[in-house]
């Protein structure tokens, strides 16, 4: 690709990072360290995954692809659980939701013959699914935790009137699910008008036909809508139970599973 054939040419964009650091210093935002860590980590991680994917492409092994995707699910679940501190059993909940979303979404694409079972398709598409499911899981877990804590009296009042734990937190779950899914829905609505998505841009820059890029992007968008919906609903249904006892009583300490 002309202009991006070497690592050095990509590193020239560090000038833009310098602008961000300068603005942080000028406004005293105290974000210089975070920006520096983000830049270094992204470089190392992308370089490492680039070599790893290149190696897996050479193997042409479906087992290696599955193992890589499983590792991505595990790391995504760990990241999501860290963002949702205070939610009992957040790690297994996130892992289950993200894993099911990935398997279900990619499974449908494979069964319908939309994409071939090759590393070139499964790794990037799987990464998109897992990444978006991770963000959705994080948002849902955090929102359920915060709302159950803030609306404790309302939940206990509903329980006192004979509601089950599911009925008592139903409004909370609906709000959490809507807030987790709306960003992607809005993004999908404005695709092609306000911005061009990453997959389409990448293909066009790489020299692909714009119509072919548009077709793939449509697949990606619908795939992400499905995976995000699955992840959000599973996280909501699995997480709220950990705040209650077997007798449908709200736990005194919500952080304990």
Regions found by a protein language model. Give the residues of each.
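C-terminal ends of transmembrane helices
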Residues: 21-33, 75-86
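Glycine-rich helix-loop "coupling/hinge" segments at transmembrane-helix boundaries
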Residues: 192-220
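Loop-to-helix transition at the N-terminal end of transmembrane alpha-helices
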Residues: 30-69
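Alpha-helical transmembrane segments of multi-pass membrane proteins
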Residues: 37, 93, 170-186, 219, ...
């Amino acid at each position: 690709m002309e202009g991006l054939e070497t690592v050095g040419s990509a590193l020239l964009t560090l000038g833009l990072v310098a602008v961000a650091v300068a603005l942080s210093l000028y406004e005293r935002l105290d974000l210089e360290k975070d920006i520096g860590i983000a830049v270094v980590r992204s470089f190392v991680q992308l370089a490492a995954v680039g070599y790893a994917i290149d190696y897996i492409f050479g193997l042409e092994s479906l087992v290696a692809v599955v193992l890589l995707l499983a590792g991505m699910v595990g790391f995504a679940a760990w990241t999501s659980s860290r963002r949702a501190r205070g939610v009992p059993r957040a790690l297994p909940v996130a892992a289950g939701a993200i894993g099911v979303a990935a398997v279900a979404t990619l499974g449908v694409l494979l069964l319908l013959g939309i994409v071939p079972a090759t590393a070139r398709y499964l790794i990037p598409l799987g990464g998109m699914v897992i990444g978006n499911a991770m963000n959705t899981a994080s948002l849902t877990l955090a929102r359920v935790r915060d709302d159950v804590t803030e609306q404790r009296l309302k939940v206990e009042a509903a329980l006192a009137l004979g509601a089950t734990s599911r009925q008592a937190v139903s409004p909370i779950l609906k709000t959490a699910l809507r807030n987790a899914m709306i960003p992607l829905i809005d993004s999908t609505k404005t695709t092609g008008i306000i911005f061009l998505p990453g997959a389409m841009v990448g293909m066009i820059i790489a020299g692909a036909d714009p119509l072919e890029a548009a077709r793939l992007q449509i697949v990606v968008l619908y795939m992400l809508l499905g995976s995000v919906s699955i992840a959000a609903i599973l996280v909501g249904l699995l997480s709220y139970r950990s705040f209650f006892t077997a007798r449908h009583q709200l736990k005194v300490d919500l952080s304990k599973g």
